[in-house]
Amino acid sequence: MKKIIIFVVLVLGAVYFFSNKYFYKPPVLRIGSECDYIPNSWEENFQSDSNIPVTNHKDYYAEGYDIQIANLVAKELGMTPSVVKLKWEDLIEALLRREIDVIFSSMLDTEERKRLIDFSIPYELKKTEYAVMVRKDGKFADIKKLEDLYQARILSQKGTYFEDAIEQIPGAVKATPVITVSDMIEELDNGKVDGIVIDVDTGTTYEKMDDDLKLITFPEGEGFIVGFSGVCAGVRKNDRRLLERIDTAISKITPRMRQRVMDQVISKVWHNNPNP
C-alpha cells in the first residue's frame, strides 16, 4: 500500500511538473497603440521576428519604437504582448473600459491626461521637441522663427498636444485638426495647409521619406514651450502595482538599448517601406 501511495505521489508530481513546464501560458499584456505614427508605431501585413500581432486587425502586425519598448517591458514582466489598434482619441477610454491594460503610443503625460490616468517614467530616446513641417516649394520654407508663420494655415492631429502648440504661433490660422499623422502629411502634401506641428523625431523620418517636405526646428528658447515630462506608458489609476512593475522594467532599458531599438526601427522603415 505504501508503495502505491509513493507511486501515485510521484505520478502526480510528474504531471504537475510537466504541465507547468510545457503547457504554462504566461498572462497577456494588452497594449493599446495608434499604429499610425512612424517611426514609433505602425502596422504591416507580414510577420517578422520582432513585430507583434494586432489582435483586432487580422493578419496584421505592429512595429515601431513604442511597440518594441512595450515588448521589452512585457518580457521583463513575464507576459506575452499583444497589440490592440485604436484611434488616438479612443486610447484612454479603452484603457478605462479595461479593453487594454496599458497604452504605448507616444503619449505625453500632460496635466489634462494625468487627471484621468497615471503615467510611467518616460521611455523616449531623448526629450520630445516640437517642430513645424512645410513644403519645400511653399512660401514658408525659409522661416527662422515661429513669428514668421504669421497668417500661415497650420494643421495638427486631433486630441494631441500639437493642437495646443499652434496657439504659440502668433497670428497663425488653425486648420481643423485631422485624425492621424498620416492625414496631416497628406493635407500638407496636397497643399491644403501651409504647415503642420509635429515632433522632431517623427518629422525627421517623414522628411527623409518625402522629398517635397522640409522640417523646420528652432533654437532652444525660441521654439515651442511644452508642458510635459515626456513620452510615457499610460495605466489606470488603480493599477498601482502594474505601474510600479512597468517603471522598473523601463528603468532597465538603458540609453544605449533605446538607441539600438530606434536604429533597428529606422532600418525597418527603409527596408520594409510600410504604408501607414
Where are these regions (language model features)?
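Short amphipathic alpha-helical coupling segments at ligand-binding clamshell hinges
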Residues: I69, K145, D199, K237-K252, ...
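Short, hydrophobic alpha-helical packing/hinge segments within bilobed ligand-binding/sensory domains
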Residues: I69-A70, D90-A94, I100, D183-E187, ...
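N-terminal Sec-pathway targeting helices
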Residues: M1-L12
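Extracytoplasmic small-molecule ligand-binding "clamshell" domains
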Residues: Y24-M107, R115, K174-P177
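Ligand-binding clefts/hinges and TM-proximal coupling segments of bilobed small-molecule sensing domains
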Residues: F17-F18, Y161-V178, K214-P219, D247-P276
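Periplasmic-binding protein-like
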Residues: C35-D36, E124-K136, E207-I250, K268-P276
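Bilobed "Venus flytrap"/periplasmic-binding protein-like clamshell domains
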Residues: C35-I38, D59-E76, A131-D183, V200-D201, ...
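Acidic, polar ligand-binding/catalytic clefts
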Residues: I67, N71, K75, T80-D148, ...
